[in-house]
């Protein structure tokens, strides 16, 4: 019983991660990212730092 419960929870967590990752990839393609976890995932600043995000993107493309 305990094993089944654990595996169900594990599957739920994994599914959430997949969904989140896909959503974050969509967020990453924008210049700024507005959802905190996605910002962390993408290494992007949140919406308050729009100008800095744009600069980082531009500098990143030049490398």
UniProtKB/Swiss-Prot annotation:
<feature type="signal peptide">
    <location>
        <begin position="1"/>
        <end position="23"/>
    </location>
</feature>
<keyword id="KW-0964">Secreted</keyword>
<feature type="disulfide bond">
    <location>
        <begin position="38"/>
        <end position="47"/>
    </location>
</feature>
<feature type="propeptide">
    <location>
        <begin position="53"/>
        <end position="63"/>
    </location>
</feature>
<keyword id="KW-0732">Signal</keyword>
<dbReference type="GO" id="GO:0090729">
    <property type="term" value="F:toxin activity"/>
</dbReference>
<protein>
    <recommendedName>
        <fullName>Conotoxin Lt11.1</fullName>
    </recommendedName>
</protein>
<keyword id="KW-0800">Toxin</keyword>
<comment type="similarity">
    <text>Belongs to the conotoxin I2 superfamily.</text>
</comment>
<keyword id="KW-1015">Disulfide bond</keyword>
<keyword id="KW-0165">Cleavage on pair of basic residues</keyword>
<dbReference type="GO" id="GO:0005576">
    <property type="term" value="C:extracellular region"/>
</dbReference>
<feature type="disulfide bond">
    <location>
        <begin position="28"/>
        <end position="39"/>
    </location>
</feature>
<feature type="disulfide bond">
    <location>
        <begin position="33"/>
        <end position="42"/>
    </location>
</feature>
<feature type="disulfide bond">
    <location>
        <begin position="24"/>
        <end position="34"/>
    </location>
</feature>
């Amino acid at each position: 019983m305990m094993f089944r419960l654990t595996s169900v929870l594990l599957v739920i967590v994994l599914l959430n991660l997949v969904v989140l990752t896909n959503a974050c990839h969509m967020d990453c393609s924008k210049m700024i990212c507005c959802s905190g976890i996605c910002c962390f995932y993408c290494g992007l600043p949140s919406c308050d730092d729009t100008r800095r995000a744009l600069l980082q993107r531009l500098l990143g493309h030049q490398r």
